[in-house]
Amino acid sequence: MSNRKYFGTDGIRGRVGDAPITPDFVLKLGWAAGKVLARHGSRKIIIGKDTRISGYMLESALEAGLAAAGLSALFTGPMPTPAVAYLTRTFRAEAGIVISASHNPFYDNGIKFFSIDGTKLPDAVEEAIEAEMEKEISCVYSAELGKASRIVDAAGRYIEFCKATFPNELSLSELKIVVDCANGATYHIAPNVLRELGANVIAIGCEPNGVNINAEVGATDVRALQARVLAEKADLGIAFDGDGDRVIMVDHEGNKVDGDQIMYIIAREGLRQGQLRGGAVGTLMSNMGLELALKQLGIPFARAKVGDRYVLEKMQEKGWRIGAENSGHVILLDKTTTGDGIVAGLQVLAAMARNHMSLHDLCSGMKMFPQILVNVRYTAGSGDPLEHESVKAVSAEVEAALGSRGRVLLRKSGTEPLIRVMVEGEDEAQVTEFAHRIADAVKAV
């Protein structure tokens, strides 16, 4: 059981200006992290950020804290989260820090860490950082203070890494692709990767101004992408979230292709190429259609708790190399160490190019069950709505009605005061009615 006070499932996150996302807290966080990480012998930390205006302020605070602890900061500028993981490994830095709130609005921000090998920090290290934060800040001797510098052509390094995950014998020259970068960290990366691999690229969501990240664009809102794909008669569309660790796709008919379908395509192609090792890891939210489709292919499937760190833990536990969330986090351990939207998207494009098949046709072997998700906001500290007898009773009624051909899942968000109500089954109208019935019970608590 974790005793972490500040760190959630994806680092520390909140509204800018409210605790804990304040300059003084982040400065002390940088100092505490520096004290803990310096014990391991390294004196440099990679710092990247997305395109939020608050990133400048938080970047400066982190730098000051790290310097006081005697560690130097290497800045990447706006850079996707998986790029920071990659650069942390290649620079042999003690850790990487990403300033981002991922898919959240611009007024939120957060801090998350990568270890020296490009994976999320273990709980024990996060707990050690929190323990250090209880102490008074002390500064190292002046001669031992950390410095700050910028990495030359960090974007170019990451672009070449992404391209190297795409087979040399294939090309994207026959594809017209609309790419939506959510006005986020991939805006100067993804279009260039696709163009350099030969694609005809139409870019949207590539004009960040500090306050428009994820605003009606990107992986969490694909309506603009769907409209543009149809208007341009493109072969497909690819959307990333604000920090580039999620990918959602759209086929030539405007149909959304989520993380479950993306993992199905990649796993099936890996099986065909004789490169799939073991099975695939999804989450409690993964569609039943994915589980059934993989079963038909003879590919083992396991569910982890929701959250990419838990998907990775389950992958490591089983020794498997592919895992995903339906939200678009896709982890391919044969390619990289964390969820990477661009790399995952490239593997789907490789399957299209190799088999001369459309994205729509690649998805045809998997029948998606209707899955309705309703988010219900609750007041933190007012008790657990999921433990209320009325909520349990309604959930039990719905589960009984669905039987073996459906599922009910209620869970708390790891980053916001939300209860997520998910109901899945074969009849969309019935599933929708059931989901709202449970959501109403949660609201009434």
Curated annotation (Swiss-Prot):
The active site is at S102. It catalyses: alpha-D-glucosamine 1-phosphate = D-glucosamine 6-phosphate. Its EC number is 5.4.2.10. Binds 1 Mg(2+) ion per subunit. GO terms for cellular component: cytosol. Mg(2+) binds at S102, D241, D243, D245. Coiled coil: none annotated. InterPro entries: A-D-PHexomutase_a/b/a-I (IPR005844), A-D-PHexomutase_a/b/a-I/II/III (IPR016055), A-D-PHexomutase_a/b/a-II (IPR005845), A-D-PHexomutase_a/b/a-III (IPR005846), A-D-PHexomutase_C (IPR005843), A-D-PHexomutase_C_sf (IPR036900), A-D-PHexomutase_CS (IPR016066), Alpha-D-phosphohexomutase_SF (IPR005841). GO terms for molecular function: magnesium ion binding; phosphoglucosamine mutase activity; phosphomannomutase activity. Its cofactor is Mg(2+). One of its GO terms (biological process) is carbohydrate metabolic process. The keyword Metal-binding applies. The keyword Acyltransferase does not apply. The modification Phosphoserine is found at S102. Activated by phosphorylation. Catalyzes the conversion of glucosamine-6-phosphate to glucosamine-1-phosphate. Belongs to the phosphohexose mutase family. This is Phosphoglucosamine mutase. The lineage of its organism: Bacteria, Pseudomonadati, Pseudomonadota, Gammaproteobacteria, Enterobacterales. The gene is glmM.
